[in-house]
A protein has these predicted regions:
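A broadly conserved amphipathic alpha-helix scaffold signal in soluble, globular proteins
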Residues: 81, 116-122, 136-139, 146
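ATP-binding N-lobe of GHMP and related small-molecule kinases
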Residues: 2-104, 123-132, 159, 177-179
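Residue-level signal for inorganic ion chemistry
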Residues: 22, 50-52, 76, 110, ...
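Short, basic/glycine-rich phosphate-binding loops at helix/coil junctions
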Residues: 56-69, 117, 139, 204-212
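Glycine/serine-rich anion-binding loops at beta->alpha junctions
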Residues: 96-125, 143, 237-251
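ATP-dependent small-molecule kinase catalytic core of the GHMP/sugar-kinase superfamily
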Residues: 2-15, 21-36, 127-237, 250-297
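Conserved hydrophobic residues forming the short capping helix/wall of the S-adenosyl-L-methionine
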Residues: 80-84, 122, 236, 261-264
């Protein structure tokens, strides 16, 4: 937990949930260098917690957030400035981020922070953008941002922005972070990365033997990730999410997952979370339909 001090009257907390890639197939490469893919995204009930405090000027300030990330590169700040620009407004905000998701873990933490910022500020600032417009803005920040705005577990194609809702099982997961940094750019440029997986249809999921095409490369480049996969595989089939470094496995009950979670070896961190087919952000927005007037104090 963060020691971040949230001021009285700040709006929140608003969740920025983690996601898992239940499988990840790379099906090609576009002329601009981006890979085309097929995947299924599912959310977790484990999230960063964001608070927003409106300002009387147009400044955007960040408090907390991912350690070591400069303010100008923080996706919350970039999302807020992008919304300012798109809506042509002169409103400001202080953003407080109680960061719980690891940076660069393959859980989409930065993208989720950006999506929650766009979603909440669209309401707080009264900009009135439609969901499709927010998704277009989100895609400019990262390929994973649209699914967090979409708010449903989804079959994804393109670079991850073409989304169709799906309803996979919602098991309990053990998620392990082997505490190494995996460079997505390095994985995606690795000459041994599979880039021609056969295309599936949505009806092939979940009966197909899906896998993560990045896993072999990440295993080779990062022995700690390979060790985490091997350790978790002893209890339940384990997979990499995104390009890692986090790995996960599904369990039928919370008790089973917690029993494994308590045995995570020293030097790694882990948590137990429930898979969700609807984003906690959207669930909260539905409960708050009367207006975004929730204050933390």
């Amino acid at each position: 937990m963060s020691s971040l001090v949230i001021p009285a009257g700040a709006q929140g907390p608003w969740p920025a949930p983690a996601k898992l890639n239940l499988f990840l197939h790379i099906t090609g490469r576009r002329d601009d260098g981006y890979h085309t893919l097929q995947t299924v995204f599912q959310f977790l009930d484990h999230a960063d917690q964001l608070y927003f405090s409106l300002r009387s000027d147009n400044a955007i300030h960040r408090f907390g957030g991912p350690p070591g990330v400069p303010v100008e590169k923080d996706l919350c700040v970039r999302a807020a400035r992008l919304l300012q620009e798109a809506a042509g407004i002169e409103k400001g905000v202080d953003i407080y981020n109680e960061k719980r998701l690891p940076v660069g873990g393959g859980l989409g933490g930065g993208s989720s922070d950006a999506a929650t910022t766009l979603w909440v500020l669209n309401r707080l600032w009264g900009t009135g953008l439609e969901p499709a417009q927010l998704a277009d803005l989100g895609l400019r920040l990262g390929a994973d941002v649209p699914v967090f705005l979409f708010g449903r577990a989804a079959w994804a194609e393109g670079v991850g922005e073409l989304l169709t809702p799906v309803d996979p099982p919602q098991p309990w997961y053990v998620v392990i972070n082997p505490e190494v940094s995996v460079s997505t750019a390095a994985v995606c440029s690795d000459p041994e990365l599979t880039r021609d997986s056969p295309r599936m249809t949505i009806r092939d999921f979940p009966s197909s033997d899906g896998h993560n095409d990045c896993e072999a490369v990440v295993r080779r480049r990062h022995p700690a990730v390979a060790a985490a996969l091997d350790w978790l595989n002893r209890s339940s089939p384990a997979r990499l999410t995104g390009t890692g470094a986090c790995v996960f496995a599904a369990f039928a009950s919370q008790a089973q997952a917690q029993a494994i979670g308590r045995r995570v070896p020293a030097g790694w961190t882990g948590f137990v979370a429930r898979g969700l087919n609807r984003s906690p952000l959207h669930e909260m927005a539905d409960r708050d339909r009367a207006g975004i007037t929730r204050a933390s104090h």
